[in-house]
Amino acid sequence: MPSARLQQQFIRLWQCCEGKSQDTTLNELAALLSCSRRHMRTLLNTMQDRGWLTWEAEVGRGKRSRLTFLYTGLALQQQRAEDLLEQDRIDQLVQLVGDKATVRQMLVSHLGRSFRQGRHILRVLYYRPLRNLLPGSALRRSETHIARQIFSSLTRINEENGELEADIAHHWQQISPLHWRFFLRPGVHFHHGRELEMDDVIASLKRINTLPLYSHIADIVSPTPWTLDIHLTQPDRWLPLLLGQVPAMILPREWETLSNFASHPIGTGPYAVIRNTTNQLKIQAFDDFFGYRALIDEVNVWVLPEIADEPAGGLMLKGPQGEEKEIESRLEEGCYYLLFDSRTHRGANQQVRDWVSYVLSPTNLVYFAEEQYQQLWFPAYGLLPRWHHARTIKSEKPAGLESLTLTFYQDHSEHRVIAGIMQQILASHQVTLEIKEISYDQWHEGEIESDIWLNSANFTLPLDFSLFAHLCEVPLLQHCIPIDWQADAARWRNGEMNLANWCQQLVASKAMVPLIHHWLIIQGQRSMRGLRMNTLGWFDFKSAWFAPPDP
């Protein structure tokens, strides 16, 4: 019998007997474990061989045998739990232990670095599952980061300095304002073994032609082997950077026929997905990666929803025991912000916008927050920390304003905290705030109407590219803000847009109201080398490494 199954049977027997040694019979024990008398005898003999108990059998009618426990079910359960942790079987661990506090304690104690059979393994604690990793779909901040570890694109953007670098394409050139040529590497392989072909690249780029920032791609052809020509309907100075974004990641052309591709995607990037469940994401270094092989062999993201309620939650590399240190911190390039929905009467009303912006000012929100949040929140006066576009102007409450609806996407504890503070402030002015939580996909599409929306945005480097690109790619914003987005996109592509002025106009009209910049923190011990936090609050797994243990 497999060891795990035998351990489960012993724990069950120990629990049924309440851990007490006793005189009993094979029939009684077999009834407890719902098995045959013969199988019960086999179990007892095997458990005795393992040193867990002794079974002194007595022969004869009416005679009772002696069962003595030498090992407790709790101790064996702990041992089994340790085995499951080492095997990264978090699903089974949760089922075995049951108690969330105990599971958390065990997970935290095993975070950080592990060196097993010559392999470097990094264990990370996160507050929610990362089930959708499909490029081109609605991806949140962390999913965007993970997708970059799994997939490659024609170009890539250096996370530290925002500079454009080669990826699948080793060189490129602009033939004319409407014609770009990219030269691709041969010998690139997908995680499932197949070699990348030009048809994969063409199919991947054509599938995103419906997205606003890629809608100007008129044609994609390969005139010669490993050469890709992209023809545009309008000039775009940002095209090479655009092709390094997550929507433009390269997928196998048969991706739609592959099982559960969104949660178990196949790319050509430095890491391949091994497991992705509600309790764990495991990615493993791809030995056939065309670039430098990752130095960390395996990354396990363990999911523990309970840490979502901790203000500094998010990403945890090392547990609080011992010498815990803050590895990296940075003020996010972005903010929480209010978005007024021009589709509703109250959302479009300028008096409502002015008054709500006044009473829900950044300083008010921070003032009414608990101290643990005040340490991590910084009042925002622009979409970026360096901008001071918003001015707090005293405004009178509009007559007849009695209620407002606020909507945000779920699985984000700080949304609830901020919304609760808003509800408290508005209630003091006799305004009821109705709060709605919807899925991230529903939020992204923006087909639901709400007076105001509570959103957050994290912009990546280079900011003069990503800020407009991010805002333009969220359909919700285009539904709520009635400006000529296509005309603005054309100006942006031509390099004719003053981005700071454009954002200032959105803030001045109260279409968007910056609220809070958040400090991004990675918690842990300084045992890892090469860790550089990016603007998404994560770090490039393939660039980090551990010094090997002392011999």
Curated annotation (Swiss-Prot):
Keywords: Activator, DNA-binding, Repressor, Transcription, Transcription regulation. Pfam families: SBP_bac_5, SgrR_N. GO terms for biological process: negative regulation of DNA-templated transcription; peptide transport; positive regulation of DNA-templated transcription. The keyword rRNA-binding does not apply. Residues 163-492 are annotated as: Solute-binding. The keyword Metal-binding does not apply. InterPro entries: SBP_5 (IPR039424), SBP_5_dom (IPR000914), SgrR_HTH_N (IPR025370), Tscrpt_reg_SgrR (IPR023767). Residues 26-49 bind DNA. Coiled coil: none annotated. GO terms for molecular function: DNA binding; peptide transmembrane transporter activity. Residues 1-116 form the HTH marR-type domain. Activates the small RNA gene sgrS under glucose-phosphate stress conditions as well as yfdZ. Represses its own transcription under both stress and non-stress conditions. Might act as a sensor of the intracellular accumulation of phosphoglucose by binding these molecules in its C-terminal solute-binding domain. This is HTH-type transcriptional regulator SgrR. It comes from Shigella sonnei (strain Ss046).
